[in-house]
């Protein structure tokens, strides 16, 4: 009997040791490997979490073209059990399923915000004009009646982006940004610059990018719209306010292409406004009689 108990204890210890070796604790997050995918979850602030996934063993180190923020010092509580690895800051709780790779996001009170779907990450290898790469797909689970906004300047006439299939690729009159904002008080930025298919249906919401070496997204919790936008600005940097004259010079495809034309347009506009204002006055300037608008 004692021999059986000893064997059972040994197997239990080996199981716990094996489980302990399946993840790597970081100062503000965790690394683990699930279902052939390396998963890294890191807090960039108490309310911003980055999820970074690559095929197992990949050494790809991505440098974002959009995200400027470096992780700030954040106190993160760490716990685990047989099923989940749990991370908790002052604002967020994150659970990583050690069997399926699914990730659940909660607010500080334990309310479910978003679910990264179990087995929801897919890497499909392909030859990108001689360069090995992947089609990258990531799926999420939203509440049935949850409203989401965003995805840029879409010409669909809809504000709520639920139950839609949109091809995110920039062109004239269609500015695409792979970012959603939920009425539950969080935002999600999918950090991939290739043409991407956004799909939302009763089963799931997903981003399916044509080219990528990783699945990389940022979860931003702000409790309301102002808080989410503040989080986005913290993550990507403050948006500069350019002078009015630049709007037609370089911010549009149908722009003024020659700097001299820009100067002529500006001068004509100034003169036109001057004449328009002076036309309301009685009299003349020099020999020019002002009558009507130009």
Give the residues covered by each predicted segment.
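Short, surface-exposed charged micro-motifs
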Residues: 22, 38-40, 77, 93-95, ...
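Bacterial Sec-dependent N-terminal signal peptides
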Residues: 1-24
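A low-complexity, Ser/Thr/Gly/Pro-enriched, surface-exposed linker/loop concept
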Residues: 23, 27, 42-85, 124-126
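Short N-terminal segments immediately surrounding and downstream of signal-peptide cleavage
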Residues: 21-35
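Aromatic- and carboxylate-enriched substrate-binding clefts and catalytic-loop regions
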Residues: 115, 275-294
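Structural preference for beta-strand elements that scaffold enzyme active sites
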Residues: 246-248, 278
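Catalytic and substrate-binding clefts that recognize carbohydrates or anionic sugar/phosphate headgroups
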Residues: 80-244, 253-255, 259-261, 266-271
């Amino acid at each position: 009997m004692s021999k059986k108990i000893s064997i059972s204890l040994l197997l239990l210890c080996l199981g716990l040791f094996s489980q302990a070796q399946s993840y790597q604790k970081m100062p503000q997050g965790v690394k683990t490997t699930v279902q052939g995918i390396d998963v890294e979850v890191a807090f960039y602030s108490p309310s911003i979490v980055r999820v970074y996934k690559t095929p197992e063993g990949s050494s790809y180190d991505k440098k974002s073209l959009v995200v400027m923020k470096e992780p700030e010092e954040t106190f993160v509580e760490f716990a685990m059990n047989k099923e989940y690895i749990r991370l908790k800051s002052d604002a967020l709780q994150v659970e990583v399923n050690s069997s399926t790779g699914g990730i659940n996001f909660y607010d500080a009170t334990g309310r479910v915000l978003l679910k990264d779907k179990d087995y929801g990450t897919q890497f499909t290898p392909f030859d990108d004009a001689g360069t090995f790469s992947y089609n990258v797909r990531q799926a999420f689970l939203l509440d049935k009646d949850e409203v989401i906004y965003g995805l840029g300047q879409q010409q669909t006439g809809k504000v709520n982006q639920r139950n839609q299939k949109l091809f995110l690729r920039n062109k004239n009159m269609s500015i695409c940004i792979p970012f959603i904002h939920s009425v539950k008080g969080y935002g999600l930025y999918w950090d991939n610059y290739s043409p991407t298919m956004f799909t939302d249906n009763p089963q799931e919401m997903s981003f399916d990018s044509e080219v990528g070496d990783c699945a990389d997204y940022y979860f931003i919790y702000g409790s309301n719209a102002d808080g989410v936008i503040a989080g986005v600005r913290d993550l990507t940097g403050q948006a500069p306010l350019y002078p009015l004259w630049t709007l037609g010079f370089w911010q549009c495809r149908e722009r003024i292409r020659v700097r001299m034309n820009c100067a002529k347009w500006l001068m004509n506009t100034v003169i036109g406004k001057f004449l328009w204002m002076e036309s309301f006055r009685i009299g003349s300037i020099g020999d020019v009689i002002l009558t009507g608008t130009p």
